[in-house]
């Protein structure tokens, strides 16, 4: 473990649901899903350092919307790991969150922030805890946190906690667009007309831009129709992605962030610049996804 007491920064990658089928609902109300997800290089950043007392500050474009109380997932992650390890091994820390991802936007920003804090504090505190231990703590914080800890192409099933890594998955050129309309995940799930859809079809044996695009054409995001009914601006975001030349466009998660798939990173950058020039108040980011290889 790295025991450097100086500050270090961890990336909190955006989670993009390329496809998301809702396949059932448990007795406790949790929905069952079957989803292919990737994680982008663009996201939030978490800086951690040992300190005289616990401190939490937020900067970045979306900082004003971030709660600073104990309900924040960053602080929940800190406190959960401290309870697990014991206060004697977990001295005070300063946590600085750079919030670059929109709030309530369907890209797992809060869950990814929590995952970054768990990874970062495990190293800062030099804890003897493995990935499975962190995932167990992460699941107690939210169903998306374990997959955000993995941060590689994966298929998530169950409530999002049954994870299967996808090998030989190359990085993708992506453009993310959010029209500035927060969407309540609970409201989207409550508005679903059907909760017993079929699971995802088998993935192609060899995944490249073309095979993935063809596969995506026969999949869905089952949350998209409900989210569109709640926030019609999502349709405008998808329209702009298509106008900019996206090879495939869809809403991620429960929205309102949408993604466009592009064959190269340079094409994605040009498309993002075009959309940004027409919609300067929207969140628009060109990025690449993390591949299945170690990065």
Swiss-Prot record:
Residues that bind ATP, according to the entry?
Answer: 102-112
GO MF terms here are:
4-(cytidine 5'-diphospho)-2-C-methyl-D-erythritol kinase activity; ATP binding
* UniProt record, GO biological process: isopentenyl diphosphate biosynthetic process, methylerythritol 4-phosphate pathway; terpenoid biosynthetic process
Reactions catalysed, as given in the entry: 4-CDP-2-C-methyl-D-erythritol + ATP = 4-CDP-2-C-methyl-D-erythritol 2-phosphate + ADP + H(+)
The annotated active site, in chain numbering, is 15, 144
| Protein keywords | ATP-binding, Isoprene biosynthesis, Kinase, Nucleotide-binding, Transferase
The superkingdom of the source organism is Bacteria
Output the SUPFAM superfamilies linked to this UniProt entry: GHMP Kinase, C-terminal domain (SSF55060), Ribosomal protein S5 domain 2-like (SSF54211)
What role does it play? Catalyzes the phosphorylation of the position 2 hydroxy group of 4-diphosphocytidyl-2C-methyl-D-erythritol.
Q: Which family does it belong to?
A: Belongs to the GHMP kinase family. IspE subfamily.
Query: Which HAMAP family does this UniProt record tie to the protein?
Result: IspE
Q: What is this protein called?
A: 4-diphosphocytidyl-2-C-methyl-D-erythritol kinase
Provide the gene name from the record.
ispE
